[in-house]
Amino acid sequence: LGEKGYSYSTGDSSVTVQHDTLPYSRYQGLYNYAHPGYNTYPYNQYQG
């Protein structure tokens, strides 16, 4: 996604989040939408 203010690792389930562009919940949902294999947090948990 390359959102400004966020970084994440696709090599494992770790995600580094800096809260200055989008709310974390929105970011996590977008990450799972873009990367279906990342399922540490269910995507539907972050909808809405």
UniProtKB/Swiss-Prot annotation:
What are the alphabetically sorted keywords of the record? Cuticle
According to the UniProt entry, its GO molecular function terms are:
structural constituent of cuticle
Judging by the UniProt lineage, the source's domain of life is Eukaryota
Q: Tell me what this protein is called.
A: Cuticle protein 10
Q: What organism is recorded for this protein?
A: Limulus polyphemus
Taxonomy, top ranks, is: Eukaryota, Metazoa, Ecdysozoa, Arthropoda, Chelicerata
